[in-house]
Swiss-Prot record:
<feature type="binding site">
    <location>
        <begin position="285"/>
        <end position="288"/>
    </location>
    <ligand>
        <name>NAD(+)</name>
    </ligand>
</feature>
<feature type="binding site">
    <location>
        <begin position="231"/>
        <end position="233"/>
    </location>
    <ligand>
        <name>NAD(+)</name>
    </ligand>
</feature>
<feature type="active site" description="Proton donor">
    <location>
        <position position="285"/>
    </location>
</feature>
<feature type="binding site">
    <location>
        <begin position="156"/>
        <end position="157"/>
    </location>
    <ligand>
        <name>NAD(+)</name>
    </ligand>
</feature>
<feature type="active site">
    <location>
        <position position="262"/>
    </location>
</feature>
<comment type="similarity">
    <text>Belongs to the D-isomer specific 2-hydroxyacid dehydrogenase family.</text>
</comment>
<dbReference type="InterPro" id="IPR006140">
    <property type="entry name" value="D-isomer_DH_NAD-bd"/>
</dbReference>
<dbReference type="InterPro" id="IPR036291">
    <property type="entry name" value="NAD(P)-bd_dom_sf"/>
</dbReference>
<dbReference type="GO" id="GO:0016616">
    <property type="term" value="F:oxidoreductase activity, acting on the CH-OH group of donors, NAD or NADP as acceptor"/>
</dbReference>
<feature type="binding site">
    <location>
        <position position="257"/>
    </location>
    <ligand>
        <name>NAD(+)</name>
    </ligand>
</feature>
<keyword id="KW-0520">NAD</keyword>
<keyword id="KW-0560">Oxidoreductase</keyword>
<feature type="binding site">
    <location>
        <position position="73"/>
    </location>
    <ligand>
        <name>NAD(+)</name>
    </ligand>
</feature>
<protein>
    <recommendedName>
        <fullName>Putative 2-hydroxyacid dehydrogenase HI_1556</fullName>
        <ecNumber>1.-.-.-</ecNumber>
    </recommendedName>
</protein>
<dbReference type="Pfam" id="PF02826">
    <property type="entry name" value="2-Hacid_dh_C"/>
</dbReference>
<dbReference type="Pfam" id="PF00389">
    <property type="entry name" value="2-Hacid_dh"/>
</dbReference>
<dbReference type="InterPro" id="IPR006139">
    <property type="entry name" value="D-isomer_2_OHA_DH_cat_dom"/>
</dbReference>
Length: 315
């Protein structure tokens, strides 16, 4: 079996990647562009990738390909319909980040409520050293306990975020689907969550109905001074509308671990805004990436490959 790993830098270098037990050849590339994909994969039986695009046109030129093993949960980079038509299996990994993502979200909540980014930025400019008092009060500090958290997406991540939030004294509301006519038990109507929540956190999948879920209209329905957190998918948010809501002061702040385009352009409006807005926190899509989570991820990727090859030999 010929295995090609197309974007190995999607795994931190200090995490060792196990090799399959069956006889194989292993070729690894740090990055692969769209123009390089076909040449690198044309003789491969198995491809490992995180984000390299496999659309219908690309898949049609890879007759030897049997399996695409994705080092992530999302499968948006693969045309699943075309892959099925061509007999190419696609395997992703779920559940590996069920601790690290919720912990990241809780950390962002505390960072926003206590204005940590602003205080940290000030210290690079020695502002405390210039103070005439033992402290100073340039940024608002509000308690997490007693705040209301609106969770959009009640899967394993959203549920765990809610559990942790309850543990630190927050009230948790799970939002019903935006256009739902009936509100399920355990959920709160979509607009009501926007109205009540001091913090909104996004954990829903990216679909045609959730793209731009948070836009100018929904932002206007949020409580003035509320915070927005997104560790889900970048396109869940209309980025320009978010910048406007921050600039006008309608939102108290935002924390993002994902963007519409990744990596973002240097002139992305949010990237530019973060340079001057202490209430805007951006982390580079690393909420999922604790050492234990990544170790679990690569282990499950290899398990997917091993199981696929075993099934292949049984046919």
């Amino acid at each position: 079996m010929k295995i090609v790993f197309l974007d190995s830098t999607a795994i931190p270098k200090h995490i060792s990647i196990p090799r399959p037990s069956f006889e194989h050849t292993w070729t690894e590339y740090e990055h692969t562009s769209a123009e390089q994909t076909i040449e690198r994969v044309k003789d491969a039986d198995i491809v490992i990738t995180s984000k390299v695009i496999f659309d219908r046109e690309t898949l049609q030129q890879l007759p030897k390909l049997k399996l695409i093993a994705i080092t992530a949960t999302g499968t948006n980079n693969v045309d699943l319909v075309a892959a099925e038509e061509m007999g190419i299996a696609v395997r992703n990994v779920t559940g590996y980040s069920s601790t690290t993502v919720p912990e990241h979200v809780i950390g962002l909540i505390f960072s926003l409520k206590h204005s940590l980014a602003g205080w940290l930025r000030d210290q690079t400019e020695a502002k405390w050293a210039e103070s005439k008092q033992f402290c100073y009060f340039d940024y608002p500090i509000t308690d997490v306990r007693g705040s209301t958290l609106g969770v959009f997406g009640k899967g394993c991540l959203g549920t765990e975020v809610g559990r942790l939030a309850n543990a630190v004294g927050m009230k948790v509301l799970y939002a019903e689907h935006k256009d739902a006519t009936v509100c399920r038990e355990g959920y709160t109507p979509f607009d009501e969550v926007l109205k009540q929540a001091d913090i909104v956190t996004l954990h829903c999948p990216l679909t045609e109905t959730t793209k731009d879920l948070i836009n100018a209209e929904t932002l206007s329905k949020m409580k003035k001074g509320a915070f927005l957190i997104n560790t889900g998918r970048g396109p869940l948010i209309d980025e320009l509308a978010l910048v406007d809501a921050l600039k006008t002061g309608h939102l108290g702040g935002a924390a993002l671990d994902v963007m519409v385009k990744e990596p973002p352009e240097k002139d992305n409006p949010l990237i530019l805004a973060a340079k001057t807005m202490p209430n805007l926190i951006i982390t580079p899509h690393i909420a999922w990436a604790s050492d234990s989570a990544v170790t679990t991820l690569v282990g499950k990727v290899m398990q997917n490959i091993e199981e696929f090859v075993q099934q292949l030999h049984q046919k």
